[in-house]
Amino acid sequence: MKIGIVGLPNVGKSTMFNSITKAGAECANYPFCTIEPNVGVVAVPDERIDKLAEMYNPQKVTKAVVEFVDIAGLVKGASKGEGLGNKFLSHIREVDAICQVVRCFEDSNVIHVDGNVNPLRDIETINLELIFADMETLTKRLDKAKKGLKADKKYQAEIDFIEKIKSNLEKGIPARALEYNEDEQEMLKDMFLLTAKPIIYIANISEEQIQNADNEEMVKQVKEYASKENAEVIPLCVKIEEELSGLEEQDKKEMLEALGLEESGLDKLIKKSYDLLGLMSFLTAGEPEVRAWTIKKGTKAPKAAGKIHSDIERGFIKAEIVSYDDLIREGSMVAAKEKGLVRQEGKEYIMQDGDVVLFKFNV
């Protein structure tokens, strides 16, 4: 899973990236300090892996990972190549989801590229550039489909679909906000539209606002905007997240408790990203390794096995599965088997989040 972090200059985007990856990306109080995308890989927080590691005491523990890409800042006109527009658009095409950092705090020491703080204007600045880029993509596709229609009537469905999306884009409605039937979903995948990508808005607030984040006026504005386009909002203080990222686990817990928070904003972001992309994890456990594997919800057992190795998918015989909760409750795989909680599943089995599995195969 690859998530692109975007935002106008000086909204806290690079500071947030630093928090996530502890990569120390250059961060300065002026536009375009992020010229090339910084990439960082971060483990998905998962208590189940920690518990299984305690049970098996393996040689190796591997959590699922998310790849975060800090994408260069942009300005109005990016879709026409202004600022770092062309680079921005090429980098954002490569990600699975977008995380847009939006400034929701006042601070006279941190300049704003447009002179004052207005989160909705900032959101619309970026979204408009993505809409303009998609309009260009769709115009080219439409021309091609109209030429194809002369030889084959099947192109009519594509033409109708493109015109449906275009008419909504012209009203400022992104592709992700629309409803699609199965055929349309397949066509949409083939168009690689930027506004079809799932999006999470990070409402970057000050430390003083954190106790009452959901009731802050700017946060409420962002939430109302997001609700109209199937987007998610996470209010967090990027400065606090940066502090948390440098602490040991126990110190981090104590700081979160002192702030009245149950978990860090970054953990929320990773979990929300998983949900937004329809992802989940199955687990493998043994003395050599305890590991989480990321798959799409609805994945069948052989396809999941292919995540581990293509040979296992090709020679799939069956999957020996116990739910994580059952395994932890019984205390061992042997005890779970004695209780009849370990199942033998075939090729049509749809994997569930938290399945602990051993694949049987023959090649």
Where are the model-predicted features located?
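Conserved G1/Walker A P-loop phosphate-binding module
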Residues: 1-111, 138-140, 145
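C-terminal-of-GTPase-core extension/linker across diverse P-loop GTPases
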Residues: 2-6, 17, 144-350, 362-363
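Generic anion/oxyanion-binding catalytic loop in active/binding sites
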Residues: 5, 24, 77, 115, ...
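Flexible interhelical turns and helix-capping residues at alpha-helix boundaries
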Residues: 9, 131-134, 192
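Glycine-rich, flexible loop/turn motifs
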Residues: 23-31, 38-40, 48-51, 80, ...
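Amphipathic alpha-helical transducer elements in NTP-driven molecular machines
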Residues: 32, 46-49, 62-68, 82-95, ...
